[in-house]
Amino acid sequence: MYHKILVPLDGSKRAERILPHVEELARRYKAKVIFLQVVEYKTVPTTEGAFINLTEQEFDQAKKQAETHLEGIQGEFREKNIESKIYVTHGPVVGGIINMAAQEGVDLIALASHGRGGISRVFYGSVAAGLLHRVDRPLLMIRSRKTE
C-alpha cells in the first residue's frame, strides 16, 4: 500500500512524535522513509520592504544543524533495517513539503501537528492546515500536545 513515506520534521521533539507511527508503517509495508526539513527564510517587514532575518552564515549553520539532526534519525531507522533518505531544503515550508512529495513520488505524508490554534495560528500559520488544503496525496497527521 505504501512504498514511500515523506516525514517532514522541524527539529523539535514534538514533531518527532510521528516517528513511532512511521516506523510501524515502514515495517509493515517495507516502505522507504524520506525525512525532510525545510529551513525557512525568516523575514521581517520594514518600511523599505522585507529583508532576510538570518545572515547567510546563520542560514548555512541552520541547514547544517538540520542535516546533522536528520542523519541521527536516519541512523536510528537504519539500525531497525528501515531504508531512508534525508533532504534539507529551503523556502516556504508547505511548498517545500508538497514539492518534495511530488519529486519523490511518495504515497503518504506523515507528520505531527503542533496543535496551534487561535491567535498563535494567525501569527505563525499552520503547516498542517496548509497541507490539508493543498496536498494531493494521503496525509497522516497526529496531534502533538505540549505535555507529550
What spans do the regions from the language model cover?
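A short acidic, glycine-rich active-site loop
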Residues: 53-68
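A cross-kingdom feature marking solvent-exposed beta-strand/loop segments within repeated
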Residues: 16-18, 80, 123, 145-146
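Gly/Ser-rich helix-loop-strand patches that form or flank binding pockets
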Residues: 24, 28, 99-148
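Structural beta-alpha unit
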Residues: 75-109, 146-148
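General small-molecule cofactor/ligand-binding pocket signal
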Residues: 36, 85-89, 140
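Short beta->alpha linker loops
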Residues: 39, 88-92, 114, 126
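Phosphate- and divalent-cation-binding pockets in alpha/beta enzyme and binding domains
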Residues: 17, 96, 118
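Small/aliphatic-rich secondary-structure junction motif
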Residues: 1-53, 147
